[in-house]
Amino acid sequence: MLNRILTLGALCLIVLSCTPTDSGASGAPNDNTTKMEPDYSNIDEETLDYLGITDPEHLSAASKRALAWPEGSRSNRWFIEYKTFDLKGDFAYEEGVVRRDPSAVIKVGDTYYTWYSRSTGPSQGFGGDIATEKVFPWDRCDIWYATSKDGWTWKEEGLAVARGEKGTFDDRSVFTVECLPHDGKYYLTYQTVGGRYEVRVKNQVGMAWSENPDGPWTKLDEPILSPADNGVWKGTAQDRFAVEKKGDFDSHKVHDPCLMAYNDKFYLYYKGEQMGEEITFGGRQIRHGVAIADNPLGPYVKSKYNPISNSGHEICVWHHDGGIAALVTTDGPEKNTIQWAPDGINFEIKSYVPGAPHAIGLLRENDDSDDPLKIMEWGLTHKYVSYDYQIIRRFEGARKERHRAKGVKTE
C-alpha cells in the first residue's frame, strides 16, 4: 500500500511539474486568462442617478450587477402584479366536482371559449384501489368546455374530448388541455394516461381537432409526443426515484402541452419530468422542452437544444416582438420569472414576478402585442379549494407604476 501511495505521489509531482502555470513570478495571472473588468469610467450621469450610484469609483458587487443589466431590463416593462377573483355561473364551486387547468381563452365572435380538465369524486393517492379509484384530481378526467360573454359568468357546455376506449393510450385520463386556433381549425393538445395509473406510468401528449369550437372533435389515433426512452429503472418496485440511469429531462413524463404557430412551423412546448427526479434549488427538477413540426398534426421532432428551460411548471407562452415569451413558475432556480427568446428556444430572464397564478389560461386575442404583458390583463387560473377539489378562477394583471402609502391622494 505504501509503495502505491509513493508511486501516485511521484506521478502527481511529475504532472504538476510538466503543467504550465497561469502565473508569472509575481503570482499575477497570465494575460491569456485574466478576466477583464468592465470599464466603468464612462458611465453617464443619468444611469448613475437612476441606479442610485453616487461614487462610480467605489462600486459594490451589487452595483456592478445593476450596471450590467440590459438597458431594457431596467424599466418596469416586464414586471407585473396579479389579483385573482371567483367566477360566476358554472365555474362557481360545486361540491364533488374538479375543474382545473383551463386552456387559453379563445374569442370567437362575441363569445369566449375555454377548455379544461373535469372529473368527479375524491382522490385516494397510490394507497387506494388504483383499478377503481382516482389517484390524483387530474386522474379519470375528460376535457370539457365552457363559454362566456363577459369573462365573468361561464356556462359549462359539456364534453369536448373523452377518454379513449379500453386498451388505447388515453383510456385512463385526458387532461391539461390547450387550444390553438389556426387557419379556420381548432387544435386541442392534452396530456394522456393509459392503463393503470402506477407511480412509474409514462404520460404522453394527444391531439384532437375540429372546424368548430363546439366540436365535434376528431382525435388522433396515436400520441403526438412521448417521453424519451433512454432512462433505466432500477428494480421492479413502483419507485420513481430508483433508477440505474435517469435519461433525458423528459424520460418519465411529457406534460402541459401548448401548441404555437411560429416561424411558419408549429412549436409544441411542454413540461418534462425525468426518471429519478430530484429536489434541486428547493423545488422539483422540472424543465421545459419544445418539439417542432411543419404541420399541426405532426410529426413532431424534439429540438436538439432541449431542455430550453432549467425551471418551471405549467407551460405559459405567448408571441412577442418576433419571439416567444414565457412565464416560468413554481420549480427550479429561475422560478417566478418572465423570460423571452428571440428564436423561441434560447430564453433569457426579463423580470422576476413572485405570486403569479398557476395553470394560467391566457387571453389569446391580446397575443403578440407591442406591450409584452398586455396578454396578462386578464385570463383564467385554478385554485385548490382542497386537495381533492379545484375551481377555475379569473386573474387580472397590471404593472405597478407607483408605491403609495395609504391615504395618499393622487391627481
Question: What spans do the regions from the language model cover?
Answer:
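C-terminal motif of bacterial Sec signal peptides marking the signal peptidase cleavage site
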Residues: 16-17
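Carbohydrate-active catalytic/glycan-binding domains of CAZyme proteins
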Residues: 24-411
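Short, linear, compositionally biased motifs with a strong N-terminal bias
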Residues: 11-12
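Short, conserved catalytic or interaction motifs in soluble domains
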Residues: 20
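Sec-dependent signal peptide recognition
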Residues: 2-8
